[in-house]
Amino acid sequence: KGGPIIMVQAENEFGSYVAQRKDIPLEEHRRYNAKIKRQLADAGFNVPLFTSDGSWLFEGGSTPGALPTANGESNVENLKKVVNEYHGGVGPYMVAEFYPGWLMHWAEPFPDISDSGIARQTETYLQNDVSFNFYMVHGGTNFGFTSGANYDKKHDIQPDLTSYDYDAPGWVTPKFDSIRNVIRKYVTYDVPEAPAPIPLIEIPSISLTKVADVLALAKEGEPVASPTPLTFEQLNQGYGYVLYSTHFNQPLKGRLEIPGLRDYATIYVDGERVGELNRCFNQYAMEIDIPFNATLDILVENMGRINYGEEIVRNTKGIISSVKINGSEISDWKMYKLPMDRMPALVSGEPYVYKNGSPEVAALGNKPVLYEGTFHLSDTGDTFIDMEDWGKGIIFINGINIGRYWYAGPQQTLYIPGVWLNKGENKIVIYEQLNNDR
């Protein structure tokens, strides 16, 4: 019939989930796959269907009548063998995800996949009539809180960076040239010149004129009270932050434990930061000293929802367990929601909003703060903002959350598309949750 849709993917890496959920009978998994296929047919998709899995996971991921394609399979002989096994002894043969790079997690080094290795593998596919899809042929950015996360037993959670670079950042690189030089040998037309780099602009200066005390601003809102901590989901909040607060009428010193922390917490006693707990480093406990008549505040951040494997169904955020000190459960909590789903407005003259450089700002110490400022542009264009000297937080540009930064790296710059910038005045708000002297 014509049209732009030539194939439709019925499922993606469902075989990984099947392999990890041995508690569910294989036939039940297969019934799910069959229903997905039926729904696509009922919706009018009459083009070939395919599934996509690691080649060793076809038993759980493939479904009759859909072409099984392999992710990351470099062995052509094995690719053809497993596709034949699950597709009636015939191809076509396709690697649906061929990785010139890899996704990146916070506090881990950049993955390194060589240019020459990718070029050689590209030629191997072409020599053996294997179709392939570069994942990614160009990278992107997980704006806002959309980055997601992986799970493994060592890290518990591996939050993805704001960047989804995949070693393909959007302009010509040596790896691009290596791949291009291989592919041009197998086409009959003249390959056009590579596109010119997108021009970038430089932001001349940014003036941060206002500062706000986030803990105080949060407590201006209406709290939700509960004997035990409530999760983000129980608070009807998907992303961002929740401030958990409780008061002590007696001094208490000892070991603070939050085994159900999801995912990152900064701990404050009477507004003074005393430490951090971090699920990605398996840090769920610390020593704490709470004086008489003091307030304990725990600011919890959702670092990204797990989107691969069996843990996708165990993705509750916030504090999902009791909080204990010396083994005794702490009760009587107030929870303040900070979804950060829109750019906060810092209104001069409002309580807890101060002029930058004032004594009140100096007194904030290492509390979490909001900085607001402006910058002016004569022309717009794509650019990057370097946050290497900051701690941890998020940035809004003209109302848009452009993503997270964190000194743990490896990412230190955030991408700002030119279409989100204005000629003339632009507004920036930085939520800095550590507020270190960096």
Kindly give the residue locations of the regions a language model identified.
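Surface-exposed, short loops/turns at beta-strand junctions within beta-sandwich domains
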Residues: D289-F292, V419-K423
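Short beta-strand-plus-loop segments that form exposed binding edges in beta-rich domains
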Residues: I298-G304, V429-D437
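Short beta-strands within extracellular/lumenal beta-sheet-rich domains
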Residues: G238-H247, G365-S378, Q412-L414
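Aromatic-rich membrane-interfacial microdomains
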Residues: R273, L277-Q283, G403-L414
